[in-house]
């Protein structure tokens, strides 16, 4: 097999470098997700936050998961992103009166109806 195909062979140096680049690119892509209150914006194809869309709880949870993995991988910006998103789950998205979490928040900061997260 020629050298260029080695990046697809598990555990070769080329494969490790290739996967490391993909990992770095994926983590860098999503770093704009965090809203000021901690909930997660949807992102466009270039990673730009879509501030005109709802910020949903499940996306915020996903980003906590992704950037928690980033912490384990040594990404220096991931701890602040996880902290901000967890803050959003504990404050902005949480229904402190009735328990559970709101499904999301509209761009004008109104809660989405039909709570599903308890």
Range-by-range predicted roles:
Residues 1-118:
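Glycan-recognition and catalytic cores of secretory/periplasmic carbohydrate-active enzymes
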């Amino acid at each position: 097999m020629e050298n260029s195909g080695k990046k697809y062979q598990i555990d070769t140096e080329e494969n490790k470098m290739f996967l490391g680049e993909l990992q770095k690119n994926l983590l860098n892509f999503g770093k704009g997700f965090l809203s000021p209150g901690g909930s997660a914006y949807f992102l466009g194809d270039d990673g730009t936050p879509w501030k005109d869309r709802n910020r949903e709880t499940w996306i915020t949870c996903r980003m906590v998961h992704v950037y928690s993995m980033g912490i384990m991988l040594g990404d220096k910006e991931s701890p602040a992103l996880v902290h901000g998103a967890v803050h959003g789950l504990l404050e902005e998205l949480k229904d402190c009166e009735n328990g559970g979490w709101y499904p999301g928040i509209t761009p004008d900061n109104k809660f989405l109806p039909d709570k599903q997260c308890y």
